[in-house]
């Protein structure tokens, strides 16, 4: 079965977060070019997802791409919004969350609004988790650690949301400005589970 049928046929998970968590590579591949990042994410997402499941991957890829050239949370989030259908359910959730971030005091209040309005979605659905990503970027744009930690504290698919926020904030700050406590543990090494000839690489060789 080829895309787009492969993302739809007998697939009750077509709007879950599985595509969104694959977005990072496309944001990295097209730094400062959110349109291209979203295009690549679309083709990837269509293999396994549909509609908002695909849009989530496009949204995050575009934000990561934009974060290489922007450092304003609202501009980065809007760059992601610009690459998905403006009236889709994901866009509505992102816009709602962005407004709550502007009008409420701190991430906890925003989390309460997200949970109140989007907590009915499954814990690994794209929409509610994307709202947490927006929250994490907004309140972490000047504090890498706070962005990741507060996103994870929001619950649901924590490893995915924390990673997405970390990718965006990492692109903003750049590797040299990330807190050492978050980078030293990697010992400058990438370990891959992909079945290729090289599974242990030092980062400078990549």
Feature map (PLM): residue ranges:
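Well-ordered mid-protein domain cores that form the structural environment of catalytic cofactors
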Residues: 1-3
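Alpha-helix N-cap/helix-initiation sites
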Residues: 53-54, 123, 158-162
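Active-site pocket-shaping loop/turn-to-helix segments
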Residues: 50
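Catalytic phosphate/nucleotide-handling subdomain of diverse soluble enzymes
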Residues: 137-198
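Short, conserved phosphate-binding/catalytic loop or strand-edge motifs used
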Residues: 36-44, 57-58, 186
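Hydrophobic, membrane-interfacing alpha helices
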Residues: 17-19, 53-55
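Conserved small/polar residues in nucleotide/adenosyl-binding loops
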Residues: 199-205
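Accessory "access/gating" subregions that flank catalytic or transport cores
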Residues: 5-14, 23-33, 42-47, 61-155
């Amino acid at each position: 079965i080829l895309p787009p049928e492969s993302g739809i046929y007998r697939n009750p998970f077509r709007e879950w977060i599985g595509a969104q968590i694959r977005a990072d590579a496309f944001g990295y591949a097209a730094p400062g070019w959110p349109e291209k990042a979203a295009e690549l994410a679309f083709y990837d997402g269509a293999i396994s997802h549909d509609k908002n499941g695909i849009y989530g991957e496009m949204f995050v890829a575009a934000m990561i791409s934009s974060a290489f050239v922007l450092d304003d949370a609202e501009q980065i989030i809007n760059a992601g919004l610009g690459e998905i259908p403006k009236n889709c359910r994901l866009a509505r959730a992102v816009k709602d969350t962005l407004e709550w971030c502007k009008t409420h005091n701190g991430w906890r209040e925003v989390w309460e609004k997200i949970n109140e309005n989007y907590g009915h979605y499954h814990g690994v659905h794209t929409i509610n988790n994307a709202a947490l990503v927006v929250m994490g970027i907004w309140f972490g744009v000047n504090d890498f650690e706070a962005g990741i930690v507060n996103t994870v504290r929001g619950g649901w698919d924590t490893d995915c949301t924390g990673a997405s926020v970390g990718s965006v904030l990492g692109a903003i700050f750049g590797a040299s400005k990330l807190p050492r406590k978050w980078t030293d543990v990697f010992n400058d090494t990438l370990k891959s589970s992909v079945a290729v000839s090289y599974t242990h690489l030092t980062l400078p060789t990549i």
